[in-house]
Amino acid sequence: MLKNENMFWQWDKEIPPIVCQALIKRGLQLDIVDAEVGNNLDDDEGKVDHSVRNSKVGFFNADTDAWLFHLLWGYMLKANINAEWNFDIEGQQPPQFTTYEKDFFYDFHEDGTFHQDGMRKLSMTVILSNPTDYDGGEFVFENGEDEVFKNQGTIIVFPSFIRHRVNPVTKGIRYSLVNWFEGPAFK
């Protein structure tokens, strides 16, 4: 069982604004599509459902963006140790670039889906936008409504079974990175 103080691990304003802007620029060059929900053992194919999730996504490539994979892997390792989760992590999915325009959101959900190579155990969100560029769009945990994350460059790592959401954006555009780290099923 998780202690409440270890529900997540955070680095506030860790990624410099110039790097956040470069990631946004690179992200906008990716193949951007409507975000899907689902995609687990019972539902092999994800589906677009704007009543649950309304955002656009693209995925970084391990060949052209290897530095990003390595950077995020390092933060995951530190969080896994510092928060004392010590989860068995064996792999990393491609980082997802996410765009939330006006009225876009992602309702409460868990990331802990199963895949052929294992299950998602740790999730990471990196806030790329300057908070003055958008209104709404707060990243929040279901059991931690007092914790609101909006600062540019903030990295949040948490167990993938923790429910969380992105509130609707009411003005502007919010950009973020999401990454998942996998391992064998919990025992």
Locations of regions flagged by a protein language model:
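Fe(II)/2-oxoglutarate oxygenase catalytic core
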Residues: M1-I155, F161-K187
